[in-house]
């Protein structure tokens, strides 16, 4: 059995062509392709702050506002941004993702999981730890921990349904839009190509 080495020269050529074509796009389109993942990250950060606020109210946590808000904004921003960048934007830019449905689906999944559900799930231990530290809410005994957090989380998940769906639809739309912009860029003529 032969071991196949990836053809880096072919991949480099494809990447070079795609990057040249993207540079020909108008600045607003280029910015959407380059910084689209940051929009997903910002929405995830807002979702994290909303989830943090809801859990703080339920658990009556009044201390350490900055200590809980900072990680609830920064961590979801970074994870959603990097996830979208590595699963949607980068494969699009390198030519590894060439299907609009695949791009839209990947964008929606990143928006749902990393932009919607992850910030809510991250808020549970952050605010649970603060509630235990400041004794602001009676916490359960060892046997009831799972049921307690399900009961506490249900109203938060209900209230976060709309922001999570909004994040999913936005990420799906952004994936579709980025795909269409890339197709538009690839259809542009080469400015310095000489025809003999």
UniProtKB/Swiss-Prot annotation:
**Sorted UniProt keywords:** Membrane, Mitochondrion, Mitochondrion inner membrane, Transmembrane, Transmembrane helix
The record's InterPro entries line, in alphabetical order, gives: TMEM126 (IPR009801)
GO cellular component, alphabetical, reads: mitochondrial inner membrane; mitochondrion; plasma membrane
Q: Quick check: keyword Membrane in the entry? A: yes
Give the Mitochondrial matrix membrane side ranges.
1-34, 79-106, 177-196
One protein family per Pfam: TMEM126
Q: In which tissues is it expressed?
A: In the retina, significant levels of expression are detected in the ganglion cell layer, the optic nerve head, the outer plexiform layer, and in the outer ellipsoide length of photoreceptor inner segments.
Q: Which residues lie on this side of the membrane: Mitochondrial intermembrane?
A: 56-57, 128-159
What residue ranges are annotated as transmembrane? 35-55, 58-78, 107-127, 160-176
Q: Does the keyword Nucleotide-binding apply?
A: no
Main localisation:
mitochondrion
Q: Could you tell me the membrane topology recorded for this protein?
A: Multi-pass membrane protein
Output the PANTHER family linked to this UniProt entry: TRANSMEMBRANE PROTEIN 126A, UNCHARACTERIZED HYPOTHALAMUS PROTEIN HT007
Q: Please describe the quaternary structure of this protein.
A: Interacts with OXA1L; promoting cotranslational quality control in mitochondria.
Family named by the database record:
Belongs to the TMEM126 family.
The entry's protein name is: Transmembrane protein 126A
Source species, please? Mus musculus (Mouse)
The beginning of the lineage is:
Eukaryota, Metazoa, Chordata, Craniata, Vertebrata
Q: Which gene encodes it?
A: Tmem126a
